[in-house]
Amino acid sequence: MEADPCRREREEMVEFQIRARGIGDERVLAAMRKIPRHLFVPKNLERVAYEDRPLPIGEGQTISQPYIVAVMTEHLEIRSHDRVLEIGTGSGYQAALLAELAAKVVSVERLPDIADRARENLARAGVTGIEVVVGDGTQGYPPEAPYDAIVVTAASPEIPQPLIDQLGKGGRLVAPVGPRECQDLVKLVKREGRVETIPLGGVCFVPLIGQFGWQGEVSP
């Protein structure tokens, strides 16, 4: 029996869905070849885990399509010594990729049950070095700030100011910004005395709920 039955599916995902569409960071590609996405989706969806589409993970949340995960990860420009903050743990898949690239990963999840499942998924996949915290992601996580990179996996009307404040000098932040339905993916780079904004294209993410995001439904 093959030790890793989904290895070929991951290879094909990387080559045909990701590299073929312009993602060229070899460290990102290697991480996506390694991390078993099928361990981060519900059991009944494992057979479609490597298709290029988002999948439901419960409580109205999703695991993003592989290509969008790759785009966001590449634009973070993560170095091996970086400290990274993720807002919206979800399934834990994005955090697992970040852990392959960075020295430290903190991930904040609003929903306790989703956070618990993410921890279980990460343990099952053998991924370590990630601190999963339950809280309001729009407030970031000040105890570990500043961060070299921040990725936000849910959309808000504008980028929460606490996240910009917790980004270190030269830091990169990637987030979807705009209405609840569909948004623009943007990259912020914190320069000396200013913040540069770079548009990355249209996306559709679940809403980021919290004090500095969409209001209401703060508790599940």
From Swiss-Prot:
Catalytic residues as annotated in Swiss-Prot or TrEMBL: 64
Pfam families: PCMT (PF01135)
Organism superkingdom: Archaea
MF terms in GO: protein-L-isoaspartate (D-aspartate) O-methyltransferase activity
Chemical reaction(s) catalysed: [protein]-L-isoaspartate + S-adenosyl-L-methionine = [protein]-L-isoaspartate alpha-methyl ester + S-adenosyl-L-homocysteine
EC id: 2.1.1.77
Intracellular or extracellular location(s): Cytoplasm
SUPFAM superfamilies, per the entry: S-adenosyl-L-methionine-dependent methyltransferases (SSF53335)
Keywords assigned by UniProt, alphabetized: Cytoplasm, Methyltransferase, S-adenosyl-L-methionine, Transferase
Main location: cytoplasm
Any single biological process term in GO: protein modification process
Function: Catalyzes the methyl esterification of L-isoaspartyl residues in peptides and proteins that result from spontaneous decomposition of normal L-aspartyl and L-asparaginyl residues. It plays a role in the repair and/or degradation of damaged proteins.
Protein name: Protein-L-isoaspartate O-methyltransferase
Organism of origin: Methanoculleus marisnigri (strain ATCC 35101 / DSM 1498 / JR1)
Phylogenetic placement of the source organism: Archaea, Methanobacteriati, Methanobacteriota, Stenosarchaea group, Methanomicrobia
Name of the gene encoding the protein in the UniProt record: pcm
